[in-house]
Amino acid sequence: MKGFAMAERNPLIIMAAGKGSRMKASADVPEWVLEEAASRPKAMIRIGQDRKPLLQHLVERAKEEGLRDICIVVAEHDEITRPHFDALRPDGIDLSFVVQTIPPGRTKPAGTAQAVQLALEAHPHWDGSSVTVANGDNLPPSGMFQAMLANPACLPAFDRDHLGLPADRVQAFAVISRNDQGGLERIDEKPDEATIQSAIWPDGTVRVSMNYFRVPYGDLLEAVRTVPEHPVRKEKELPVALSNWSEGHPDGLHVLPLAGAFLDLTHPQDIVKAGERLDQGGFELRI
């Protein structure tokens, strides 16, 4: 697997434009946590004893596991992320940034699929490589990126009972079903209980998407360019683009069953918990 990884460019797009709208005030956390959540992009919240941003941990993890050409998508008016990495000057990787602006006539960006489209169009030299897409506000178990590099097109499907996250949060995660050939059958967003029951795997697990996947450059670019806006939210959504592409390429997206816990920043309490877990050594992948 490692030889395969090092033989390719292995580009990575990290979605880091989230503002952390659910980082509301809470009496259960110290004041410094609330200040951190209110003053920084969610991916740049500092955790652990070394006070290193979560996004920096993610970039370092990706580099260690063979992804050396990294593009970070940041929000308009983000004055923290790029200056941090410019000062850091991480070696051994090609690090670039794309800004997702708010189009005229809108109050928010045009969606996650549009963010990926911007990153792809800014890197035409990636054509011919498979592109990994990552979520900037959580940290996967170590080994996940390397496991993904063995497949030109894959979607990790994590056992939801071993994510290390609160059950009420996990309950809302998109569930993944795969066919007998190991390809993606469907992704069900915000599943109800009946949908969850229908998605139980033969081994008794329910497996969910953590918003990481890998698809060849040309296929991914076509998928995000052609996905329609959601009729209500008026956004071009990445899960829809991925599902649409998969429907047109039967067995094209390999579902990779994995297990392991994530560090996730959704609520202020997560900042303290993630830091404590990181100081203890983080999490390992189980395949």
Where are the language model's segments positioned?
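A structural signal for short hydrophobic beta-strand segments in well-ordered beta-sheet cores
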Residues: 44, 175-178, 255
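Phosphate- and divalent-cation-binding pockets in alpha/beta enzyme and binding domains
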Residues: 80-83, 143, 241, 273
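Conserved core of the sugar-phosphate nucleotidyltransferase
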Residues: 139-223
